[in-house]
Swiss-Prot record:
It is an enzyme of class 7 (translocase). GO terms for biological process: lipoprotein localization to outer membrane; protein localization to outer membrane. InterPro entries: AAA+_ATPase, ABC_transporter-like_ATP-bd, ABC_transporter-like_CS, ABC_transpr_LolD-like, LolD_lipo_ATP-bd, MacB-like_ATP-bd, P-loop_NTPase. It comes from the Bacteria. It comes from Pseudomonas syringae pv. syringae (strain B728a). This is Lipoprotein-releasing system ATP-binding protein LolD. Its EC number is 7.6.2.-. It is a peripheral membrane protein. The lineage of its organism: Bacteria, Pseudomonadati, Pseudomonadota, Gammaproteobacteria, Pseudomonadales.
């Protein structure tokens, strides 16, 4: 992987109409992430951190500005092409995991591989290995309702990593984890940033997690500033 930015945005903004008024949530944001870089975004509740992740991940449309993911401008892509790019180049860990309730932990992690047409035996082998790596080798056949909050979060993290994307975005990734498990996830991110040059963009309230990143940015008054 080259040092070309895996993610960038220019003059990114988002506003909402509330009656006759326009409420500005984000304005004029500039950001670049490079291979292997780990960046944390902190800020108070309601500052727009999750909105920013959704814009950067192509899950929402900006009111102004542009986002490039893996060299592709998201606004120039159709919905299908954007979805394929996200599946290939981006892993996303939501604050509340968003696992498919009718599928097992193993099947949830397999899903991105199967969407990308990986043969089922290979998908199961790779997914099993990754779930073992995050400490869930004994929970492969359990559905989300049979897992604890921390276990569900680890399944979501494994699902985000399974395609070996160039970038992983995480929204409060350690919020449901005990200290030991959270530290294990941090160690895994550090290892992957070095060995695979995976970039990580993390939204968190946990300053102990943020301080372990390469850069910490604060979102305040709709803008990103160095923390």
């Amino acid at each position: 992987m080259s040092d070309k930015a895996v993610l960038s945005c220019r003059n990114l903004g988002k506003s909402y109409e509330e009656g006759p008024e326009s409420v500005v949530v984000l304005s004029g944001l500039q950001l670049e992430l490079h291979p292997g870089e780990r960046v944390a975004i902190v800020g108070s509740s309601g500052s727009g951190k999750s909105t920013l992740l959704n814009l950067l991940g192509g899950l929402d449309t900006p009111s102004e500005g542009s986002v490039w993911l893996a060299g592709e401008e998201l606004s120039a892509l159709g919905e299908k092409a954007r979805g394929l790019l996200r599946n290939r180049a981006l892993g996303f860990v939501y604050q509340f995991h968003h696992l498919l309730p009718e599928f097992t932990a193993l099947e949830n992690v397999c899903m991105p591989l199967l969407i990308g047409r990986t043969p089922i035996p290979e998908a199961r082998k790779r997914s099993t290995a990754l779930l073992e790596r995050v400490g869930l080798g004994h929970r492969l056949a359990h559905k989300p309702s049979e897992l604890s909050g921390g276990e569900r979060q680890r399944v979501a993290i494994a699902r985000a990593l399974i395609n070996q994307p160039g970038l992983v975005m995480l929204d409060e990734p350690t919020g449901n984890l005990d200290h030991h498990t959270a530290q294990g996830i941090q160690d895994l991110m550090r290892e992957l940033s070095t060995s695979s040059r995976t970039a990580f963009l993390i939204v968190t309230h946990d300053m102990s997690l943020a301080r372990q990143m390469d850069r910490v940015l604060r979102l305040e008054d709709g803008r990103l500033v160095e923390a």
